[in-house]
Amino acid sequence: LNLFTVVEIGDHHVTILDGDRFEPLWRFPSRIALHGGAKYSPDGRFVYLASRDGWVGKYDLYGLRPVAEARVAVNTRNIAVSSDGRYLIAGNVLPPTLAILDAGDLSVLKVIAVKGDKDAASRVSAVYDAAPRRSFIVALRDIPEIWEISYQDNPRPVPAGLIRNHEEGLKEGAFDRGPFPVRRIRLEESIDDFFFDPSYANLIGASRDGGRGQVVNLDVGRKIAEVALPGMPHLGSGITFEYEGRLVLATPHLKEGAVSIVDMKDWRTIKRIATAG
């Protein structure tokens, strides 16, 4: 299929466009304040849409019909679909939770309260699928943490607190054994939006208030570098490409007309390109 999903502003409708002829195939009413980030099943047959007021809908692009709908929150930030097409996760602002749904019928499988060490709640900033890791990656707005949530059938147990022995059969301490165990990565500053490198080993994140980005290695679970990115980079719209034999990241900025080019080997900003807006 060669289709576009167009979320219309103002009249609460969605249009499915033929990508070859740019002609509407199906126009249907949607919930109000629909999020523009449509997500798709791996085979491209189904599109998932979330509204700001917590409704998640599933639509069949073969039959051009709605399939299922569920409400997951009062205020939802965004959604992600697992790489195997089995699960959908919704990151919520109110209540501060993560809702994991069966992507088939949108039934709720697990609701995770988003809390820190002292039970302080946090809104969700963003959630994305990390396909090679078979996990969801979540950024928290009010607590400086990144969460990795595995959706594998037999996930590796995640330590909860101090562990004396990791040897199989002799493990001591508390473990989150799943399903959907939460691995917490603690940072110095919270992250509002982020971007993966092609290997999905590194996450590049930025906050709304800061003039710099953080590079977090998901394998070792800590920040490994900082990137000078003033002007509030919009990393969700970033891309990577090869330039003069090296891998670089290009990211636009929200507060000024500029695009920053970052060398992904040493994380230096090698060029700043002014734009018209």
Where do the PLM segments sit?
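Predominantly soluble domains enriched in secretory-pathway, periplasmic, or organellar proteins
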Residues: L1-G277
